[in-house]
């Protein structure tokens, strides 16, 4: 029997993820969003973001996915739902993504987009976004609530801590440790550990704020 799926967030991030839903597993029923709208892309907005729990409790919905790009907001919503309904949070993985070792998926709320590559022995934890064409190489650990943008490259044996944003076409060389709450700008090349949260840009990447 197919599960009834709703998205938390009705915006461009939801539009990017929706085509990857497996129609054999899920019936999409609508959105929850704080904007003053009643529908999005032909589906109803069922309530505000924090109105979702009664729907899970009464069985109106039995699968959810958080479609908000901002790491901090996505983390807040994930923890709100996961407290009582962790098992209702699904993973959405494109059939065109390549995940070399199935045990790399170590949590829930994970999105892996078209053409992404997840190397051997990688560990992806809760509520991570791995966008189109991103590459995460062998033995790298990505803690929860991160966002890896399109065509970003994280080389092997890295450790990416919580709430990191890795910008489009940026590169993190092998064996580095990246502090939580770090933003790496598009096209940056990170060549040493980042021990202090902030925004890093350029080649080599340097902190700007």
For each of these PLM feature ranges, what is it?
Residues 1-44, 48-56:
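Hydrophobic, well-ordered beta-alpha structural blocks that scaffold small-molecule cofactor pockets
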Residues 9, 21, 64, 89, ...:
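Generic structural signal for conserved hydrophobic packing positions in ordered secondary structure
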Residues 10, 33-34, 69, 94, ...:
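Cofactor-binding loop segments of dinucleotide-utilizing enzymes, especially the Rossmann-like FAD-
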Residues 12-15, 72-73, 105:
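Short alpha-helical
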Residues 92-208:
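Structural signal for interior beta-strand "rungs" in well-ordered beta-sheet cores
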């Amino acid at each position: 029997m197919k599960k009834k799926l709703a998205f938390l967030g009705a915006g461009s991030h939801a539009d990017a993820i929706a085509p990857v839903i497996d129609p054999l597993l899920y019936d999409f029923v609508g959105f929850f969003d704080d904007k003053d709208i009643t529908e999005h892309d032909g589906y109803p907005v069922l309530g505000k973001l924090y109105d979702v729990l009664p729907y899970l409790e009464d069985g109106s919905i039995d699968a959810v996915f958080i479609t908000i790009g901002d790491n901090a907001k996505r983390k807040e919503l994930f923890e709100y739902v996961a407290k009582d309904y962790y098992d209702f949070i699904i993973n959405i993985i494109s059939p065109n993504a390549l995940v070399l070792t199935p045990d790399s998926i170590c949590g829930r709320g994970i999105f892996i987009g078209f053409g992404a590559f997840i190397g051997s022995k990688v560990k992806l934890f809760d509520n991570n976004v791995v966008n189109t064409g991103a590459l995460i190489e062998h033995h790298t650990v990505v803690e929860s609530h991160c966002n890896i943008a399109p065509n970003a490259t994280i080389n092997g044996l890295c450790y990416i801590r919580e709430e990191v944003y890795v910008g489009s076409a940026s590169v993190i060389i092998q064996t580095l440790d990246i502090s939580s709450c770090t933003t790496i700008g598009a096209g940056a090349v990170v060549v040493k550990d980042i021990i202090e949260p902030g925004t890093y840009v350029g080649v080599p990447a340097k902190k700007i704020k």
